[in-house]
């Protein structure tokens, strides 16, 4: 599986204390994404400028002369950089690092079981997130089976924009689906993410039906609330109306934040400035809307 991070002691990706495995690659293009390194799935060069000690090793090493000094600061010409990663091998300060790495199921298992005791005492487990982990369905199925056989609680965080056959492969090994819904309006969804939400909504309905008729998993819906995108009472009311007819165990609202801006800079990208954090009172308003539809928050 191609991943870009393993985060321990997470308390935001399902119940209890969890280990979150972040897969690389996503088939949506949400402009507010706080994990830009997860999107392309291709290898990238990350530059942590605050860790650079200006030793100059990368200046001498780079055949394309992508590294240089400007005003006493280390700069990277991304237009000529070929992401060969030779510079990362000589950067002992770890200012230059590759984004992705390939890990097999055995390596993932070894990393995950390190925190098994925390899982047992907190009701936690492992969450596969991203990116979109279901784009690597064969690898995901393999590691889910391993975790399930060890009695580790398993969760998959997905945007749902995949063929339902992928869900069918992992349903027997998944205890919880964290299912992202951005909008109900199809045209708005395509504008914000680059894709229609028709498949996403249809897959959620299918998961709901399986859950209701004996599926041995929980279904949580997570809604990013983004000012300048979907933070609209009318849109949230439509989502609530849609979810009210489904077998949803819980709904969570994730207010947009700007903590990912530094990641964009480290990749040589510019974060969009059109998105805003919604005020707390707006979150309370939509909680009331969902509450009136008897959706558990």
Model-derived regions: residue spans:
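Short gly/ser/thr-rich secondary-structure transition/capping motifs
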Residues: 2-4, 70, 157-161
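Auxiliary Fe-S-binding modules of radical SAM enzymes
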Residues: 2-15, 212-216, 225-297
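N-terminal pre-triad scaffold of radical SAM enzymes
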Residues: 4-57, 74-83
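N-terminal-biased segments
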Residues: 14-15, 22, 40, 44-45, ...
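Iron-sulfur cluster-binding cysteine motifs and their immediate structural context
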Residues: 31-38, 57-76, 86-101
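Conserved dinucleotide-binding and phosphotransfer motif residues
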Residues: 94, 149-150, 293
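Short glycine-enriched, charge-decorated loop/helix-capping segments at active-site entrances
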Residues: 97, 190-196, 267-276
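Conserved AdoMet/S-adenosylmethionine-binding subsite of the radical SAM
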Residues: 106-260
């Amino acid at each position: 599986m191609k991943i870009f991070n393993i985060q321990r002691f997470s308390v935001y990706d399902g119940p209890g204390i969890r280990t979150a495995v972040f897969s690389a690659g996503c088939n949506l293009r949400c402009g507010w994404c706080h994990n830009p390194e997860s999107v392309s799935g291709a290898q990238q060069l990350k530059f942590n400028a605050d860790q650079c000690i200006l030793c100059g090793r990368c200046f001498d090493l780079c055949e394309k002369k992508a590294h240089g000094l400007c005003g006493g600061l280390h700069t990277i010409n991304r237009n000529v950089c070929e992401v060969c990663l030779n510079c990362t091998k000589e950067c002992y300060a770890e200012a230059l690092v590759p984004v992705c790495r390939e890990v097999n199921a055995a390596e993932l298992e070894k990393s995950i079981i390190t925190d098994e005791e925390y899982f047992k005492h907190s009701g936690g487990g492992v969450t596969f997130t991203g990116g979109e982990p279901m784009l690597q369905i064969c690898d995901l199925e393999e590691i889910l089976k391993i975790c399930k056989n060890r009695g580790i609680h398993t969760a998959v965080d997905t945007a749902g924009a995949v063929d339902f056959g992928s869900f069918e492969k992992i349903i027997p090994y998944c205890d919880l689906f964290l299912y992202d819904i951005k909008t109900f309006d199809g045209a708005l969804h395509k504008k914000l993410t680059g894709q229609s939400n028709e498949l996403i909504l249809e897959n959620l309905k299918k998961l709901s039906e399986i859950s209701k008729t004996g599926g041995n998993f929980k279904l949580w819906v997570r809604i990013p609330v983004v000012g300048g995108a979907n933070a609209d009472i009318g849109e949230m009311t439509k989502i609530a109306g849609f979810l009210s007819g489904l077998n949803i165990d819980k709904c969570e609202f994730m207010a947009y934040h700007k903590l990912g801006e530094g990641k964009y800079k480290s990749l040589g990208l510019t974060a969009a400035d059109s998105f805003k954090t919604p005020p707390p009172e707006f979150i309370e308003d939509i909680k009331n809307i969902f509450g009136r539809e008897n959706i558990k928050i």
